[in-house]
Amino acid sequence: MSKPIVAMVGRPNVGKSTLFNKLAGKRISIVQDTPGVTRDRVYAESEWLNRKFTMIDTGGIEPESSDIIVKQMRRQAQIAIEMADVIVFVVDGKEGLTAADQEVAQMLRKSKKPVVLVVNKIDRLALEENSYEFYNLGIGDPITISASQGLGLGDMLDEVVKYFNDPSEDEEDDEYIRIAMIGKPNVGKSSLINRLLGEERVIVSNVPGTTRDSIDSYLETEDGKFILVDTAGLRRKSKVKEEIERYSVIRTYAAIEKADVAILVIDAEQGITEQDEKIIGYAHEMNKAIMVVVNKWDLIEKDDKTLSNYQKDLQQKLKFMPYAKYLFISALTGQRVHKILSTAKYCYDNYSKRVSTGLLNDVISKAVLMKEPPVVALKRLKIYYATQVATKPPKFVFFVNDPNLLHFSYGRYLENQLRESFDFDGTGIEIEYRARKE
């Protein structure tokens, strides 16, 4: 089940980043060194009242003029409207209501998306009356907070989670495998989706997707029920490349967050780029099921070793996710396109797999017998037992004497044992080590 997305919108210097970091707490961390993935704090996981959600800070670079500020805020608001389940609109209680605030409020009102209006920098009771003028925005009662002091955050979060769907309401979509087609523009993502829809000749309905430019295509085939999401995004030109790049990353992240299977589509002639590595790195960090589809394979001159060598080169560049599945196709000619959905279903089945506790502990016991944990600081890791606590992705908890005694190479060894024993091919898995007394 994907987590709700909460997007923060507001002018520069109203305290969005302070609020973002306060809510994220210690949850933002570098889990591992994944090549090509920048930790620019675009997103963070958070939780309130046992509801987990993803926060996205839409703020980009700091503009220099008021005209640019308004343009940037329009973009922020548009992105939030496109992809968020709930929008948090942050305004400055000390500076007061501005024309830019009013313009963005108008966009948010028209969107019909849930909006929580937050008046920041109200750090003492005497400033409460500063919030009254924000009623003029017409988007509900303002909630006063001080992000820097942590005041009022509980009231704000209570309001945010009110708008989340009850998990049971999402059960209908749960029978569909949600696939995000990700990758740079012009690699053939849309052509590929059209080819899949055109070839299958089945029940297809189009419903508005998470982004204004994309349509979620519902598709039923002999391989299963699928939702195909094209992450094309906006194609507006901008003088500020960094800003557009950030917004592109935010959009793609949101699509991956809501997906079961992430399919990175690359152009066979261009090969894989740093941007591709960054994009698929997000899916890897979230432990999604992952496929790499090399499109336009018909344009490559080949001999009997071309495909094998090309795949080895890709696997070397993407060695941080050795479990990914690879396909070489042509959306234009239809070559191997029929294998995409069956491979996605295979990856999804592994992503959804549950392992019995008995079998799991047998495998772990044998793995430890074959290779003992190394000694760390004169002590050795002891694994008491393990259990699977979740699927989509598969998550395991290992109860041990001291998690600090786990050497990363031994952790990798145990993960490989799980993968080989239970066939977690094509999907990320998560292993957590918890301390337990003997």
Swiss-Prot record:
InterPro entries: AAA+_ATPase, G_ENGA, GTP-bd, GTPase_Der, KH_dom-like, KH_dom-like_a/b, P-loop_NTPase, Small_GTP-bd. It comes from the Bacteria. Residues 4-168, 177-352 form the EngA-type G domain. SUPFAM superfamilies: P-loop containing nucleoside triphosphate hydrolases. Coiled coil: none annotated. Keywords: GTP-binding, Nucleotide-binding, Repeat, Ribosome biogenesis. CDD domains: EngA1 (cd01894), EngA2 (cd01895). Belongs to the TRAFAC class TrmE-Era-EngA-EngB-Septin-like GTPase superfamily. EngA (Der) GTPase family. Associates with the 50S ribosomal subunit. This is GTPase Der. The lineage of its organism: Bacteria, Bacillati, Bacillota, Clostridia, Eubacteriales.
